[in-house]
Amino acid sequence: MKTITFDKLLLKTAFCCMASDGNIDKREIVLIKTMCGNSPLFTNFNFEVEINNLVSKLNTQGKDFITHYFELLKHSVLTEQEELTLIDFAINTIKADEQIEYSEIKFFKVIRHNLNISDEKVLAVYPDIEQFLEQDIISESYLEKITNQYFDTLELPQFEQIHLFDAHSLDKLKKDE
């Protein structure tokens, strides 16, 4: 299994969370770009190139891209702080479009299952995500079942390449809503 740097894992996590409901919302793009820009982990980093590389891979690989992400996450050795950072990127991305779909909760539960941090520590930082942590994944077979259910209902469209826009365009987008 190929290893991945933590910054790439964070970006891939946020990207997969953004696409997990079958829709890429501009607010999610802006949030991910902002999170990457605010993090010291992303240096010498061209967001537009990196995010569009992920779009292209998702478009060509489809569900295999998501499966590969889960495998990368499963085999990553992360510190507790890195796990909290990954959860932060995931939760904030899921909430960015102000619509939390059940597919996104299922997706997060699969992510959560691959982390070692306790629910108590997660809830201490994110007390409002209890529904994301409810224990319905109780065995490997159930995890496999919920993962398969996620993939069975997932319809990934061909996503457009992402073009960044300036703050003025973002303000206009917010006013149009």
Language-model regions, residue ranges each:
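Small-residue-enriched hydrophobic alpha-helices in membranes
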Residues: M1-E177
